[in-house]
Amino acid sequence: MASLKDMRVRIASTKATQKITKAMQMVAASKLRRAQLAAEAARPYAERMDAVISNIASAAAGSPGAPVLLAGTGKDQVHLLLVCTGERGLSGAFNSSIVRLARERALSLMNQGKEVKLFCVGRKGYEQLRRTFDRQIVENIELRSVRQLGFVNAEDIAHKVVARFNNGEFDVCTLFYSRFKSVISQIPTAQQIIPLVVEAPAANAGPATSYEYEPEEDEILAGLLPRNLAVQIFRALLENNASFYGAQMSAMDNATRNAGDMIRKQTLIYNRTRQAMITKELIEIISGAEAI
């Protein structure tokens, strides 16, 4: 059995850990609100941008001059998985859930005889994926030095992806990130971004509105598609940021509660042990006095 001194050290250590987790919870809570507002503000813009491009793309579908980002290469052999995760841990299953979804997709494609390449954004995803797919990772970008996420960060990633596509390095690109729903719910999401997936109009939708475009649809799409790619990546980064702080806040809250439970149990054991030792000493003193 541990000595009273060891028990006191253990209780003090647990209390110190509880202070750290409580502080991290409060920091995450303070940053969550701003990150959540940024993610929610980006959604309408990204969705509207996607809708506008889908409308133009529907008119340009089948055109021999359609941009390759829309039409694709005509093949489905090489897949690039753009996996966006966080730079830090202590956030529950936030990073591992995104990695798990990407890993499952990669293994499924490889079982179908497809070639898979990985483009990692974020240190944690890279560290986990390289254990299994070290040879498939073609690029890794870390954002640890970025204090405030900006559109320029997404543009940089989009430029690298488009450059690889134009070089013929892949046929299909899928974006993986975590969509923020609430503090306790973040949804791992996979979204194909190259070639662009044009959603068909709903069966119960009314007649489609006819638009006239100037310049031609193909020319408009050639300028809009690369920007839309950056917009979708920027949205994913913002969603990830909010999801990270939500997951961290929840994880640190659970850790703080667990530390409190552990402190109570350790204190109870300490008090019982101390009481038993005092009782034993009293019995020894009384027995010695009676013997005299």
Swiss-Prot record:
The keyword Ribosomal protein does not apply. GO terms for cellular component: plasma membrane; proton-transporting ATP synthase complex. One of its GO terms (molecular function) is ATP binding. InterPro entries: ATP_synth_F1_ATPase_gsu, ATP_synth_F1_gsu, ATP_synth_F1_gsu_CS. Coiled coil: none annotated. GO terms for biological process: proton motive force-driven plasma membrane ATP synthesis. Its main location: membrane. It is a peripheral membrane protein. It is found in: Cell inner membrane. It holds the Pfam family ATP-synt. Keywords: ATP synthesis, Cell inner membrane, Cell membrane, CF(1), Hydrogen ion transport, Ion transport, Membrane, Transport. Produces ATP from ADP in the presence of a proton gradient across the membrane. The gamma chain is believed to be important in regulating ATPase activity and the flow of protons through the CF(0) complex. F-type ATPases have 2 components, CF(1) - the catalytic core - and CF(0) - the membrane proton channel. CF(1) has five subunits: alpha(3), beta(3), gamma(1), delta(1), epsilon(1). CF(0) has three main subunits: a, b and c. Belongs to the ATPase gamma chain family. This is ATP synthase gamma chain.
